[in-house]
Structures are given as C-alpha cells and as structure tokens.
C-alpha cells in the first residue's frame, strides 16, 4: 500500500524516514550548545503547488487557489497575522486534500517536497551539521558562524533559484534539546 510505505535511510549522518506524510529526520536524544539556523520554506506545499502547477489539472479554477496562496504570502510578509489566518488555513487545507485519494483535489504533492529538501540537505552537508529535517524545513548547527554563514546562505539562495521556493532564516544562539523530529525545544542564551 503506497500510503503506508516508508523508507528508512541515513542522510547527512542523521536517520530519516521518508513516507506518505513527508520526510522526517533528527538526531535522536540530542543536546548541543551553539549557533543554529532554523531554515523553513515559506508555505512550502502550497508554494510547490503553485510553482509546478501541481493539482491544476483537477481544479476548475486554479486562479482561485492562486489568489488564496498569494494572499497568504502577502499578509505574512506584511506581518498581519489576523488577516493572514483564514488564507493560511485555506492554503494548507488545499494542499492537504491533495494527498487524500477520496478528494476531488487528489494529486499527491508530498514526494516532490521531500526530494527538493533532500537536495538542499545534500548541498548544505559540507558546511554545517544537520540536526533535523522536518517536511518543510531544517535545523542546522554551524561550527563557525563567521566562516560558514555566507556559504550556507549562498547554497540556500541557489536552491531557491532552482526551485522557485523562498526560505525563512532564523539564527538561534543557545541550546537545543531534541528527543526526535517532533519533540525538541530551543533555549536562548
């Protein structure tokens, strides 16, 4: 059954599971102190959907989806959380329906996102330590911020150019305590 299949592999020294719901990897029971980058793709699956026209073949009016998605991104950039909320919910709901076989919007998208993030991780591997890869973003630890940040930024920029996606960067200095991919917290210095 395709929906239940999963593949367990090691990527950048981190155990990963690739399955119907996304790609997930994390160093288990990990604690470290240092400088980390939290790198997330902006509205990843809806952005993939628009960039590569995934699902358009089953939509009567894809321009309606584009309006919802573009409004979500516009309000995010303006920092207007209240105005953004309904568009964000609709944007993500549309992408979520795309992996449901009983949905009129069925057109699986998740594998596309998994492969593109895997590509990013492989290009970043020489310049940082992968801590976590979670469906729409990654956390990496920098050994030397002054030496490595610009190279990482260049790799991410090149990835954005190839994929049409946009990334959000947050630099974090402190400690990470991680049980697994969905159970972690960051503590500021």
Please annotate each region the language model reported.
Residues 49-53, 134-135, 152-155:
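Composition- and surface-driven signal marking solvent-exposed, interaction-prone regions
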Residues 123-127:
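A structural motif corresponding to the C-terminal end of an alpha-helix
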Residues 1-37, 41-50, 85-115, 119-122, ...:
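Common nucleic-acid-contacting/processivity interface regions adjacent to the catalytic cores
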Residues 44-96:
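Metal-dependent catalytic core segments for phosphate chemistry
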Residues 129-134, 169:
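Short beta-strand
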Residues 98, 141-189:
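C-terminal polymerase-core module
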């Amino acid at each position: 059954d395709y929906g239940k299949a999963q593949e367990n592999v090691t990527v950048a020294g981190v155990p990963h599971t690739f399955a119907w719901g996304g790609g997930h990897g994390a160093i288990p029971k990990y604690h470290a102190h240092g400088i980390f980058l939290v790198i997330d793709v902006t509205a990843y699956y809806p952005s993939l959907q628009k960039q590569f026209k995934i699902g358009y073949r089953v939509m009567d009016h894809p321009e309606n989806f584009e309006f919802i998605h573009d409004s979500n991104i516009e309000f995010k950039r303006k920092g207007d959380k209240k105005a953004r909320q309904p568009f964000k919910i609709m944007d993500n709901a549309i992408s979520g329906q795309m992996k449901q076989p009983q949905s009129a919007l069925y057109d699986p998208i998740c594998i596309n996102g998994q492969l593109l993030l895997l590509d990013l991780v492989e290009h970043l591997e020489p310049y940082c330590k992968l801590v976590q890869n979670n469906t729409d973003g990654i956390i990496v630890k920098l050994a030397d911020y002054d030496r490595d940040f610009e190279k990482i930024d260049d790799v991410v920029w090149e990835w954005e150019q190839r994929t049409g996606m946009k990334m959000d960067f947050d630099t974090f200095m402190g400690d990470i305590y991680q049980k697994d991919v969905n159970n972690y917290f960051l503590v500021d210095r």
